[in-house]
Amino acid sequence: MARRYWNINLEEMMVAGVHFGHPTKQWNPKMAPYIYAKVKRKGIHIPNLTRTARFLSEACDLVFDAASRGKEFLIVGTKPKAAGSVVRAAIRARCHYVNKKWLGGMLTNWFTTKTRLHTFRDLRMEQKTGRLNRLPKRDVAMLKRQLSRLQAYLGGIQYMTGLPDIVILVDQHEEYTALRECITLGIPTICLIDTNCDPDLADLPIPANDDAKPSIRLILNKLVFAICEGRSSYIRNP
């Protein structure tokens, strides 16, 4: 896999607050190789941005290569600070996404998920054609509630026809269930890992602040740019 230049610089990461970790009492000792220093006054760890830049560059190379071969991506970030950035990133890169709640078994029980997606598509079609409104009022109200729930939880994967090739996780702790499902199925993962995370669980960890919106946005923007470049390469050379 060839290495490319992704315009990743330390100053930009510092402005985005990528270098702010969790309180020192919350740290995971496995993160020691990724930590630059401890700020005593604030009691927090500072991730080593040189290593962050290196791993982010490797992640960009990986997703570019995968996208250039037509692979499918799933971006997962369900906490409020990540949800908006996840949607924008996924739409821009034409990726699947989950930004509300991870339903247990979404990947490991793919048959059930696929059945739910069929139900979701059928209800949407019923609504678009107006057939839904011809039903009794009680049934209409119940089906509309079901449609709203399916839209919230499955709207980002409504066009997913099979398991993703790579999953990008914004917060390892928050998305632990999704991460375990990926590990079970052998799906490669790219994880933003803060100083309280376990880097061994991710196939490609990116040490970074996973709580600040600017930090999340910067990391996702770099990955999305690489995916878009890879997709363009795939279109030119199918």
UniProtKB/Swiss-Prot annotation:
One of its GO terms (molecular function) is structural constituent of ribosome. GO terms for cellular component: chloroplast; mitochondrial small ribosomal subunit. The keyword Ribonucleoprotein applies. GO terms for biological process: translation. Disulfide bonds: none annotated. It is found in: Plastid, Chloroplast. Keywords: Chloroplast, Plastid, Ribonucleoprotein, Ribosomal protein. The keyword Chloroplast applies. It comes from the Eukaryota. Its main location: plastid. NCBIfam families: rpsB_bact. Belongs to the universal ribosomal protein uS2 family. This is Small ribosomal subunit protein uS2c.
